[in-house]
């Protein structure tokens, strides 16, 4: 497993991520493995996912640098399909691909279930650093869509409070602006994909760069309500067919 980590670090700041990730890899790759030079570590899921929390934060509450998203509390099916997508090449991020290579589907489901069951508190939203007109454009797209361009509102799939919908549609609040923008941009540019029919790719293809910036600014500025949680499966009729009910 360690031999797989021969990838090149893209920039010096990523070194602070690489070193704890390297140290944490063994428990994830070899469940139950003991250290030969020290006492046995408890074989808990929390110990096994140390490679995940090295970047995604304690309990998966999000990395401090605004790039690594929150995992805690997201639908287990969503997390599971993202792990599959990284492992199988539908999402492109080399450290994740190396980390997950060779891990079986059943173990990925265990990881997904663990993080889905974490309910760490959300931090307050970042201060909106965008003009009022930009924020209004983002609000309109998120809550109303743009029928003339065939753009459904974000709430039509992601729920009235943008908390997602079971089994596999994620919430959109509590995420950093840069992460939201980069992921929608990846959909638009074909660097992120999902099981067909890929409804998010269809939506992202219709968004302009200004649309993406406005959505990212507005969504990241919204406080997370106390009732924030995924809606039950089938709570709303999706505006388009999505592979595996929105494996996004």
List the predicted regions and their residue ranges:
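N-terminal secretory signal peptides that target proteins for export/translocation
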Residues: 1-15
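Bacterial N-terminal signal peptides
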Residues: 16-29
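Sec/Tat signal peptide C-region and signal peptidase I cleavage site
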Residues: 30-36
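Flexible coil segments in periplasmic/lumen-exposed cytochrome c-class electron-transfer proteins
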Residues: 37-49, 58-61, 94-166, 189-248
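The feature marks the first
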Residues: 39-89, 93
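Short cysteine/histidine-rich metal-coordination sites, predominantly Zn2+-binding motifs
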Residues: 69-74, 157, 170-178
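Extended intrinsically disordered, low-complexity coil regions enriched in Ser, Thr, Gly, Ala
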Residues: 75-97, 174-185, 189-198, 233-234
């Amino acid at each position: 497993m360690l031999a797989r980590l021969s990838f090149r670090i893209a920039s010096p700041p990523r070194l602070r991520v690489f070193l704890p990730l390297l140290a944490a890899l063994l428990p994830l790759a070899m469940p139950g493995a003991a250290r030969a030079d020290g006492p046995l570590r408890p074989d808990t899921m929390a110990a096994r996912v140390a490679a995940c929390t090295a970047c995604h934060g304690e309990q998966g509450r999000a990395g401090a640098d605004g790039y690594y998203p929150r995992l805690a509390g997201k639908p287990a099916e969503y997390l599971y399909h993202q792990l599959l997508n990284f492992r199988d090449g539908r999402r492109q991020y080399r450290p994740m691909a190396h980390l997950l290579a060779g891990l079986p589907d059943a173990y990925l489901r265990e990881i997904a279930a663990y993080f889905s069951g974490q309910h760490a508190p959300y931090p307050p939203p970042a201060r909106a650093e965008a003009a009022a007109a930009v924020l209004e454009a983002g609000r309109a797209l998120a809550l109303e869509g743009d029928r003339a361009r065939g753009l459904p509102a974000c709430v039509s799939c992601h729920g009235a409070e943008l908390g997602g919908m079971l089994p596999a549609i994620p919430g959109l609040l509590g995420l950093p602006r840069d992460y939201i923008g980069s992921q929608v941009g990846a959909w638009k540019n074909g660097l992120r994909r999902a099981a067909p029919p890929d409804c998010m790719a269809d939506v992202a293809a219709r968004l302009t760069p200004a649309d993406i910036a406005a959505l990212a600014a507005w969504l990241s500025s919204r406080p997370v309500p106390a009732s924030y949680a995924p809606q039950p499966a089938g709570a709303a009729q999706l505006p388009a067919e999505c592979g595996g009910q929105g494996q996004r």
